[in-house]
Design a protein with these regions (language model features):
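N-terminal Sec-pathway targeting helices
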Residues: 14-31
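Non-catalytic, solvent-exposed segments at the cell envelope interface
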Residues: 2-10, 20, 37-395
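Alpha-helical transmembrane segments
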Residues: 30-38
Protein backbone atom coordinates (compact mmCIF):
# COMPACT_ATOMS: atom_id res chain seq x y z
CA UNK A 1 0.00 0.00 0.00
CA UNK A 2 1.31 3.39 -0.94
CA UNK A 3 2.61 5.57 1.84
CA UNK A 4 0.15 8.31 2.92
CA UNK A 5 2.24 11.15 4.29
CA UNK A 6 0.77 13.54 6.75
CA UNK A 7 0.92 16.31 4.14
CA UNK A 8 -1.07 14.34 1.64
CA UNK A 9 -4.28 14.25 3.69
CA UNK A 10 -7.07 16.19 1.97
CA UNK A 11 -9.94 17.72 3.92
CA UNK A 12 -13.16 15.92 3.37
CA UNK A 13 -16.05 17.55 1.55
CA UNK A 14 -17.87 17.59 4.86
CA UNK A 15 -15.07 19.59 6.50
CA UNK A 16 -14.93 22.07 3.63
CA UNK A 17 -18.69 22.53 3.83
CA UNK A 18 -18.51 23.16 7.57
CA UNK A 19 -15.93 25.92 7.08
CA UNK A 20 -18.11 27.67 4.52
CA UNK A 21 -21.06 27.45 6.86
CA UNK A 22 -19.07 29.21 9.57
CA UNK A 23 -18.02 31.97 7.14
CA UNK A 24 -21.61 32.45 5.98
CA UNK A 25 -22.89 32.58 9.55
CA UNK A 26 -20.27 35.22 10.45
CA UNK A 27 -21.18 37.31 7.38
CA UNK A 28 -24.88 36.96 8.19
CA UNK A 29 -24.28 38.08 11.79
CA UNK A 30 -22.28 41.11 10.60
CA UNK A 31 -25.03 42.06 8.13
CA UNK A 32 -27.70 41.67 10.80
CA UNK A 33 -25.66 43.74 13.26
CA UNK A 34 -25.17 46.50 10.68
CA UNK A 35 -28.87 46.36 9.90
CA UNK A 36 -29.75 46.74 13.56
CA UNK A 37 -27.32 49.65 13.96
CA UNK A 38 -28.65 51.39 10.85
CA UNK A 39 -32.21 50.78 11.97
CA UNK A 40 -31.47 52.19 15.42
CA UNK A 41 -29.74 55.20 13.85
CA UNK A 42 -32.72 55.74 11.53
CA UNK A 43 -35.26 55.68 14.35
CA UNK A 44 -33.00 57.87 16.52
CA UNK A 45 -32.75 60.45 13.74
CA UNK A 46 -36.48 60.24 13.04
CA UNK A 47 -37.35 60.80 16.71
CA UNK A 48 -35.05 63.82 16.93
CA UNK A 49 -36.29 65.49 13.75
CA UNK A 50 -39.90 65.09 14.83
CA UNK A 51 -39.19 67.53 17.68
CA UNK A 52 -38.71 70.42 15.26
CA UNK A 53 -41.53 72.92 14.81
CA UNK A 54 -42.94 73.10 11.28
CA UNK A 55 -43.60 76.33 9.42
CA UNK A 56 -47.23 76.68 8.35
CA UNK A 57 -49.22 78.96 6.07
CA UNK A 58 -51.87 80.87 8.00
CA UNK A 59 -53.81 83.37 5.94
CA UNK A 60 -54.35 86.38 8.17
CA UNK A 61 -56.73 89.32 8.03
CA UNK A 62 -54.25 92.12 8.61
CA UNK A 63 -55.16 95.79 8.65
CA UNK A 64 -52.93 98.66 7.65
CA UNK A 65 -52.81 99.63 11.32
CA UNK A 66 -51.38 96.24 12.28
CA UNK A 67 -48.78 96.44 9.52
CA UNK A 68 -47.78 99.95 10.53
CA UNK A 69 -46.54 98.56 13.83
CA UNK A 70 -43.95 96.66 11.80
CA UNK A 71 -43.03 98.88 8.87
CA UNK A 72 -44.98 102.13 8.98
CA UNK A 73 -48.32 103.45 7.75
CA UNK A 74 -49.88 101.52 4.89
CA UNK A 75 -53.24 101.92 3.20
CA UNK A 76 -55.53 99.21 4.58
CA UNK A 77 -57.01 98.20 1.24
CA UNK A 78 -53.77 98.23 -0.74
CA UNK A 79 -50.61 97.54 1.28
CA UNK A 80 -48.26 98.93 -1.36
CA UNK A 81 -44.88 100.43 -0.66
CA UNK A 82 -44.39 102.81 -3.57
CA UNK A 83 -41.16 104.50 -4.52
CA UNK A 84 -40.46 106.51 -7.67
CA UNK A 85 -38.48 104.89 -10.46
CA UNK A 86 -35.87 107.65 -10.16
CA UNK A 87 -34.91 106.48 -6.65
CA UNK A 88 -35.14 102.74 -7.29
CA UNK A 89 -31.73 101.09 -7.80
CA UNK A 90 -31.05 98.87 -10.78
CA UNK A 91 -32.01 95.29 -10.05
CA UNK A 92 -29.93 92.30 -11.07
CA UNK A 93 -31.26 89.65 -13.49
CA UNK A 94 -33.56 87.28 -11.65
CA UNK A 95 -32.50 84.01 -13.29
CA UNK A 96 -30.77 82.00 -10.53
CA UNK A 97 -27.78 79.99 -11.72
CA UNK A 98 -26.39 78.50 -8.53
CA UNK A 99 -27.35 77.29 -5.08
CA UNK A 100 -29.67 74.44 -6.04
CA UNK A 101 -29.27 70.99 -4.55
CA UNK A 102 -26.56 68.99 -6.24
CA UNK A 103 -23.15 70.65 -6.08
CA UNK A 104 -24.34 73.07 -3.39
CA UNK A 105 -26.85 73.11 -0.55
CA UNK A 106 -28.19 76.47 0.64
CA UNK A 107 -29.85 76.66 4.06
CA UNK A 108 -31.05 80.05 5.33
CA UNK A 109 -30.89 80.80 9.06
CA UNK A 110 -33.33 83.51 10.17
CA UNK A 111 -32.99 85.11 13.58
CA UNK A 112 -36.23 86.96 14.24
CA UNK A 113 -36.69 89.57 16.93
CA UNK A 114 -39.83 88.14 18.52
CA UNK A 115 -39.31 87.01 22.08
CA UNK A 116 -40.83 84.00 23.80
CA UNK A 117 -44.62 84.29 23.71
CA UNK A 118 -44.56 87.13 21.15
CA UNK A 119 -45.48 87.21 17.49
CA UNK A 120 -42.51 87.06 15.11
CA UNK A 121 -41.54 90.42 13.65
CA UNK A 122 -38.53 91.63 11.68
CA UNK A 123 -35.69 89.38 10.61
CA UNK A 124 -32.92 90.57 12.94
CA UNK A 125 -30.34 88.28 11.35
CA UNK A 126 -30.30 86.73 7.87
CA UNK A 127 -27.51 84.23 7.34
CA UNK A 128 -27.05 81.82 4.42
CA UNK A 129 -25.08 78.59 4.89
CA UNK A 130 -23.72 77.19 1.62
CA UNK A 131 -22.16 73.72 1.56
CA UNK A 132 -20.09 73.21 -1.58
CA UNK A 133 -19.51 69.47 -1.80
CA UNK A 134 -16.83 69.75 -4.48
CA UNK A 135 -14.60 72.23 -2.64
CA UNK A 136 -15.59 70.95 0.84
CA UNK A 137 -16.35 74.53 1.85
CA UNK A 138 -19.04 75.87 4.19
CA UNK A 139 -19.67 79.54 3.44
CA UNK A 140 -21.58 81.73 5.89
CA UNK A 141 -23.02 84.82 4.19
CA UNK A 142 -24.63 87.54 6.29
CA UNK A 143 -27.13 89.82 4.54
CA UNK A 144 -27.14 93.35 5.96
CA UNK A 145 -30.63 94.11 7.20
CA UNK A 146 -30.65 97.72 5.91
CA UNK A 147 -30.11 96.49 2.34
CA UNK A 148 -32.57 98.29 0.04
CA UNK A 149 -34.09 95.57 -2.15
CA UNK A 150 -37.08 95.01 -4.37
CA UNK A 151 -39.66 92.84 -2.64
CA UNK A 152 -41.78 90.43 -4.72
CA UNK A 153 -43.96 92.40 -7.15
CA UNK A 154 -47.03 90.26 -6.61
CA UNK A 155 -46.78 88.05 -3.54
CA UNK A 156 -50.07 86.14 -3.33
CA UNK A 157 -51.97 89.25 -4.39
CA UNK A 158 -49.89 91.77 -2.41
CA UNK A 159 -47.57 94.28 -4.08
CA UNK A 160 -44.66 95.54 -2.05
CA UNK A 161 -42.19 97.72 -3.98
CA UNK A 162 -38.78 98.58 -2.47
CA UNK A 163 -37.85 98.37 1.20
CA UNK A 164 -35.26 97.04 3.63
CA UNK A 165 -34.63 93.32 3.29
CA UNK A 166 -35.77 92.45 6.83
CA UNK A 167 -39.18 93.95 6.03
CA UNK A 168 -39.72 91.12 3.55
CA UNK A 169 -39.87 88.61 6.39
CA UNK A 170 -42.18 90.81 8.47
CA UNK A 171 -44.71 91.27 5.67
CA UNK A 172 -44.73 87.57 4.78
CA UNK A 173 -45.35 86.68 8.41
CA UNK A 174 -48.08 89.28 8.83
CA UNK A 175 -49.94 87.97 5.80
CA UNK A 176 -49.30 84.20 5.91
CA UNK A 177 -47.50 83.17 9.10
CA UNK A 178 -44.08 81.54 9.43
CA UNK A 179 -44.15 79.73 6.07
CA UNK A 180 -45.18 82.96 4.35
CA UNK A 181 -42.31 84.83 6.02
CA UNK A 182 -39.79 82.26 4.81
CA UNK A 183 -41.23 82.09 1.32
CA UNK A 184 -41.27 85.86 0.85
CA UNK A 185 -37.71 86.27 2.13
CA UNK A 186 -36.55 83.44 -0.17
CA UNK A 187 -38.20 85.10 -3.17
CA UNK A 188 -36.55 88.41 -2.25
CA UNK A 189 -33.08 86.80 -2.14
CA UNK A 190 -33.67 84.95 -5.40
CA UNK A 191 -35.04 87.99 -7.25
CA UNK A 192 -32.26 90.34 -6.12
CA UNK A 193 -29.20 88.06 -5.86
CA UNK A 194 -30.10 84.91 -7.80
CA UNK A 195 -29.73 82.80 -4.64
CA UNK A 196 -31.85 79.65 -4.57
CA UNK A 197 -32.62 78.68 -0.96
CA UNK A 198 -33.15 74.95 -0.37
CA UNK A 199 -34.57 75.26 3.14
CA UNK A 200 -35.07 77.62 6.07
CA UNK A 201 -34.40 77.42 9.80
CA UNK A 202 -35.83 80.10 12.10
CA UNK A 203 -35.22 80.84 15.77
CA UNK A 204 -35.94 83.71 18.15
CA UNK A 205 -33.94 85.40 20.91
CA UNK A 206 -34.90 83.01 23.69
CA UNK A 207 -33.81 80.03 21.57
CA UNK A 208 -30.29 81.44 21.18
CA UNK A 209 -29.92 81.83 24.96
CA UNK A 210 -31.12 78.29 25.71
CA UNK A 211 -29.03 76.62 23.01
CA UNK A 212 -25.80 78.36 24.06
CA UNK A 213 -26.45 77.50 27.71
CA UNK A 214 -27.04 73.85 26.76
CA UNK A 215 -23.62 73.89 25.07
CA UNK A 216 -21.97 75.15 28.25
CA UNK A 217 -21.34 78.62 26.83
CA UNK A 218 -19.13 79.73 23.95
CA UNK A 219 -15.53 80.92 23.89
CA UNK A 220 -15.60 84.40 22.34
CA UNK A 221 -12.68 86.83 22.12
CA UNK A 222 -13.63 90.35 23.24
CA UNK A 223 -11.81 93.51 22.24
CA UNK A 224 -11.37 96.24 24.84
CA UNK A 225 -14.44 98.17 23.63
CA UNK A 226 -16.50 94.97 23.36
CA UNK A 227 -15.54 94.04 26.93
CA UNK A 228 -16.68 97.46 28.20
CA UNK A 229 -20.00 97.14 26.37
CA UNK A 230 -20.62 93.59 27.61
CA UNK A 231 -19.86 94.66 31.19
CA UNK A 232 -22.46 97.43 30.87
CA UNK A 233 -24.92 94.86 29.51
CA UNK A 234 -24.36 92.58 32.51
CA UNK A 235 -24.98 95.44 34.89
CA UNK A 236 -28.24 96.34 33.09
CA UNK A 237 -29.42 92.74 33.16
CA UNK A 238 -28.62 92.43 36.85
CA UNK A 239 -30.67 95.58 37.58
CA UNK A 240 -33.58 94.24 35.51
CA UNK A 241 -33.53 90.93 37.39
CA UNK A 242 -33.56 92.75 40.73
CA UNK A 243 -36.47 94.95 39.58
CA UNK A 244 -38.43 91.84 38.64
CA UNK A 245 -37.78 90.37 42.07
CA UNK A 246 -35.56 87.61 40.73
CA UNK A 247 -32.92 86.89 43.32
CA UNK A 248 -30.34 85.33 41.06
CA UNK A 249 -28.45 86.37 37.98
CA UNK A 250 -25.80 84.34 36.22
CA UNK A 251 -23.06 86.93 36.62
CA UNK A 252 -19.83 85.90 34.94
CA UNK A 253 -16.40 87.46 35.25
CA UNK A 254 -15.36 88.81 31.86
CA UNK A 255 -12.21 90.48 30.62
CA UNK A 256 -10.55 91.61 27.44
CA UNK A 257 -9.56 88.50 25.48
CA UNK A 258 -11.18 85.06 25.29
CA UNK A 259 -14.19 84.55 27.59
CA UNK A 260 -16.66 81.72 28.05
CA UNK A 261 -19.93 83.63 27.55
CA UNK A 262 -23.32 82.30 28.63
CA UNK A 263 -26.47 82.52 26.52
CA UNK A 264 -27.52 86.00 27.68
CA UNK A 265 -24.08 87.42 26.95
CA UNK A 266 -23.73 85.71 23.56
CA UNK A 267 -27.10 87.12 22.48
CA UNK A 268 -26.10 90.62 23.60
CA UNK A 269 -22.75 90.28 21.81
CA UNK A 270 -24.38 89.11 18.56
CA UNK A 271 -27.05 91.83 18.55
CA UNK A 272 -24.99 94.84 19.66
CA UNK A 273 -24.44 97.39 16.89
CA UNK A 274 -23.21 100.41 18.87
CA UNK A 275 -20.05 99.19 20.59
CA UNK A 276 -18.08 102.23 19.43
CA UNK A 277 -18.53 105.21 17.12
CA UNK A 278 -17.24 103.24 14.15
CA UNK A 279 -19.55 100.29 14.82
CA UNK A 280 -22.42 99.43 12.50
CA UNK A 281 -24.61 96.62 11.24
CA UNK A 282 -21.59 95.43 9.26
CA UNK A 283 -19.55 94.75 12.40
CA UNK A 284 -22.63 93.25 14.02
CA UNK A 285 -22.88 90.64 11.26
CA UNK A 286 -19.17 89.90 11.72
CA UNK A 287 -19.86 89.17 15.40
CA UNK A 288 -22.80 86.96 14.44
CA UNK A 289 -20.57 84.89 12.16
CA UNK A 290 -18.00 84.63 14.98
CA UNK A 291 -20.75 83.19 17.19
CA UNK A 292 -21.73 80.64 14.53
CA UNK A 293 -18.11 79.56 14.07
CA UNK A 294 -17.70 79.27 17.85
CA UNK A 295 -20.79 77.05 17.99
CA UNK A 296 -19.47 74.79 15.22
CA UNK A 297 -16.10 74.53 16.97
CA UNK A 298 -17.76 73.72 20.30
CA UNK A 299 -20.07 71.04 18.88
CA UNK A 300 -17.23 68.77 17.74
CA UNK A 301 -15.73 68.82 21.27
CA UNK A 302 -18.88 67.67 23.09
CA UNK A 303 -19.31 64.17 24.48
CA UNK A 304 -22.14 62.02 23.04
CA UNK A 305 -24.38 62.73 26.05
CA UNK A 306 -23.65 66.49 25.91
CA UNK A 307 -24.29 66.55 22.18
CA UNK A 308 -27.57 64.68 22.64
CA UNK A 309 -28.68 67.28 25.22
CA UNK A 310 -27.82 70.16 22.86
CA UNK A 311 -29.68 68.48 20.01
CA UNK A 312 -32.80 67.95 22.15
CA UNK A 313 -32.71 71.57 23.32
CA UNK A 314 -32.09 73.08 19.90
CA UNK A 315 -34.56 71.06 17.84
CA UNK A 316 -37.52 71.93 20.05
CA UNK A 317 -36.76 75.66 19.69
CA UNK A 318 -36.40 76.02 15.93
CA UNK A 319 -38.92 76.18 13.11
CA UNK A 320 -38.30 74.91 9.58
CA UNK A 321 -40.08 74.50 6.26
CA UNK A 322 -38.09 71.34 5.46
CA UNK A 323 -39.80 67.97 5.59
CA UNK A 324 -38.34 65.17 7.71
CA UNK A 325 -37.19 63.33 4.58
CA UNK A 326 -35.47 66.46 3.25
CA UNK A 327 -33.68 67.01 6.55
CA UNK A 328 -32.49 63.39 6.64
CA UNK A 329 -31.17 63.74 3.10
CA UNK A 330 -29.22 66.90 3.94
CA UNK A 331 -27.87 65.42 7.17
CA UNK A 332 -26.61 62.34 5.32
CA UNK A 333 -25.02 64.56 2.68
CA UNK A 334 -23.37 66.81 5.27
CA UNK A 335 -22.04 64.10 7.60
CA UNK A 336 -19.05 62.99 5.44
CA UNK A 337 -17.79 66.59 5.36
CA UNK A 338 -18.38 67.45 9.02
CA UNK A 339 -14.79 67.12 10.25
CA UNK A 340 -13.09 68.29 7.06
CA UNK A 341 -14.74 71.58 6.15
CA UNK A 342 -13.09 74.85 5.25
CA UNK A 343 -15.14 77.65 6.83
CA UNK A 344 -15.55 80.91 4.90
CA UNK A 345 -17.21 84.08 6.25
CA UNK A 346 -18.84 86.44 3.78
CA UNK A 347 -20.98 89.59 3.78
CA UNK A 348 -23.62 90.71 1.30
CA UNK A 349 -23.52 93.35 -0.04
CA UNK A 350 -19.73 93.18 -0.30
CA UNK A 351 -17.45 96.08 0.61
CA UNK A 352 -17.32 98.69 -2.15
CA UNK A 353 -20.60 97.54 -3.77
CA UNK A 354 -23.07 99.65 -1.78
CA UNK A 355 -23.60 103.16 -0.47
CA UNK A 356 -25.77 104.79 2.15
CA UNK A 357 -28.67 106.97 1.12
CA UNK A 358 -31.78 108.51 2.65
CA UNK A 359 -34.99 107.39 0.92
CA UNK A 360 -38.73 107.66 1.42
CA UNK A 361 -40.05 104.69 3.40
CA UNK A 362 -43.60 103.92 4.62
CA UNK A 363 -42.81 105.36 8.04
CA UNK A 364 -40.94 108.39 6.73
CA UNK A 365 -37.50 109.12 5.36
CA UNK A 366 -34.87 106.63 6.50
CA UNK A 367 -31.32 105.52 5.82
CA UNK A 368 -30.77 102.44 3.66
CA UNK A 369 -27.96 100.71 1.78
CA UNK A 370 -28.30 100.97 -2.00
CA UNK A 371 -26.61 98.12 -3.80
CA UNK A 372 -24.85 97.18 -7.03
CA UNK A 373 -26.76 93.93 -7.48
CA UNK A 374 -24.86 92.73 -10.57
CA UNK A 375 -21.53 92.97 -8.72
CA UNK A 376 -22.89 91.18 -5.67
CA UNK A 377 -24.36 88.38 -7.71
CA UNK A 378 -20.95 87.76 -9.30
CA UNK A 379 -19.19 87.90 -5.92
CA UNK A 380 -21.69 85.55 -4.29
CA UNK A 381 -21.29 83.03 -7.07
CA UNK A 382 -17.50 83.18 -6.84
CA UNK A 383 -17.47 82.75 -3.05
CA UNK A 384 -19.95 79.87 -3.15
CA UNK A 385 -17.83 78.18 -5.83
CA UNK A 386 -14.91 78.20 -3.40
CA UNK A 387 -12.94 81.00 -5.05
CA UNK A 388 -10.93 83.34 -2.85
CA UNK A 389 -12.47 86.81 -2.95
CA UNK A 390 -11.06 89.91 -1.25
CA UNK A 391 -13.08 90.76 1.85
CA UNK A 392 -13.99 87.19 2.77
CA UNK A 393 -12.47 85.43 5.76
CA UNK A 394 -11.22 81.84 5.48
CA UNK A 395 -10.67 79.66 8.54
Amino acid sequence: MAYQGRYNNKPSGKARGGAWKIVLIVILCVVLLLGLLLGAAYFYLESKLNKINRATFEEKDVSGQDLSALIGNLDESDPTISISETTAPTQAPTEPDYGETGKMINILLIGQDGREGEEAKLADGIMLFTLNKETRTLTTTSFLRDSYVKLPENYRGHTCGWNRINTSYALGYAWYGSAGAMEMLNLTLENNYGVKVDGNIELDFSAVVKIVDAMGGLDIELTGTEYTKMLEHQQRLNTQYETLGISWYRWIDIHEGVNNLNGDMVLAYARERHIDNADSDIKRTVRQRKVINAMLSKLVTLSPSELNNVIDTALSLVTTDLTTDEMKTYILELTPYLFDLKLVSNQCPAEGTYWGEMVELPDGVGGVLKIDFDANKRILQAVMNGEEVEGTAIQ
